[in-house]
Amino acid sequence: MSRDTIVAQATPIGRGGVGILRVSGPLAQQVAEQVLGKTLTPRMANYLPFKDSDGSVLDQGIALYFKAPNSFTGENVLELQGHGGQIVMDLLLKRILQIDGIRLARPGEFSEQAFLNDKLDLAQAEAIADLIEASSEQAARSALKSLQGEFSNKINELVDSVIYLRTYVEAAIDFPDEEIDFLADGKIETHLREIIAKLAKVKNEAKQGAILREGMKVVIAGRPNAGKSSLLNTLAGREAAIVTDIAGTTRDVLREHIHIDGMPLHIIDTAGLRDATDEVEKIGIRRAWDEIEQADRILLILDSTENQVELDLVRSEFMAKLPPHIPLTIVRNKADLSGEAEVLNEQNGLTVISLSAKTQKGVDLLRQHLKQSMGYQVCTEGGFLARRRHLEALEQADIHLQAGLIQLTEFYAGELVAEELRIVQHHLSEITGQFTSDDLLGNIFSSFCIGK
């Protein structure tokens, strides 16, 4: 790995009460000697002036030095905590970069150093970014659990079980003349089924973590004046969209970020769908369809006071244009005017909810439906956060475990069982970074903040 000494601002760019510069690498102590005029004792706070190359004082603050390997990155680390003015931070950063052998850190490079120095695994490194970006208390708590190793521990337990079983299978292959037929005695099958059950549990928890991290994109669609913007306002709990009796009031895409019991929802209100002649409205309708095609779920809003034949036509025309893979929920709005009961039922394979966005009756039915449609389960203790790549790795591991079970129970093919288990181990180890390509590492860490 690179032994460069890197520096970056660890606090957000802009003005604040405190600004922190972080230096990591072999030359961290040399930076302290040149900028502070003093050799620092590890893990001791020092209040000192920060000096320019000509000896003039740039700022004064607290300096902390951590000697490798006892630091976040596993390298020598120096932190300078000064006043948070951006000019001051820039001057101090410029001063440090004048020292030979020091360069500006790439995004996520401090966390990458920590990963490469075995201070944390890849799932924990990703949890740092997730904790910073958490949009709810539950997401933050779950990210912290991942950072503390809860997710990694579950993966490592699975890997250990797979390694144990691989050893057992390969022993059966290497010693075929033993009196006991290890492949047929039932022990390998029992262990394999136990691993499959454990993996299923971790997959379910990871799915919850992915929902908590990434949320669900819900697009509200329908004809003008059906009550789309009113529903957006009701779900958001504020007047996010202008609501009038004039058809076509909403002409552009409106976005709101909300939470339902900790589950993040990206709610998108769109222009009313109709044959428009106004050029601006046409653009809004094109954008509406762009959002519809990228949605996790569509809420088609119908005005329940209109003629049922007309509503059936609206629904059939919309469904004819809708990409087949996108889930659809029918919302019959204005139940307070039509006299419909606020209920949820199934019709022809579609969920239909009658509600009133104006009075908010029946809206809780919609909230519960959105949670259930994503498979989200409220966990008061908090789980761990997971990413799509984690889910994909777990899914691949499950596929190869099932394949291994078939090879064992139907064909007694020990070599093929061992190969499937090797592939399972590889996919699981990708999650923690034990087996990970350099390209994947680059993609992951490049999405981090500069000073992380």
From Swiss-Prot:
Top-level taxon of the source organism: Bacteria
For this UniProt record, the keywords arranged alphabetically read as follows:
Cytoplasm, GTP-binding, Hydrolase, Magnesium, Metal-binding, Nucleotide-binding, Potassium, tRNA processing
Which one GO biological process term can you cite for this protein? tRNA methylation
Q: Where does (6S)-5-formyl-5,6,7,8-tetrahydrofolate bind?
A: 22, 79, 119, 452
Kindly report the protein's main subcellular placement as a broad class: cytoplasm
Q: What class of enzyme is it?
A: hydrolase
Q: Which GO terms describe its cellular component?
A: cytosol
Documented EC number(s): 3.6.-.-
Q: Which family does it belong to?
A: Belongs to the TRAFAC class TrmE-Era-EngA-EngB-Septin-like GTPase superfamily. TrmE GTPase family.
Name of the protein in its database record: tRNA modification GTPase MnmE
What organism does this protein naturally occur in? Histophilus somni (strain 2336)
Task: Write the lineage as a comma-separated list.
Answer: Bacteria, Pseudomonadati, Pseudomonadota, Gammaproteobacteria, Pasteurellales
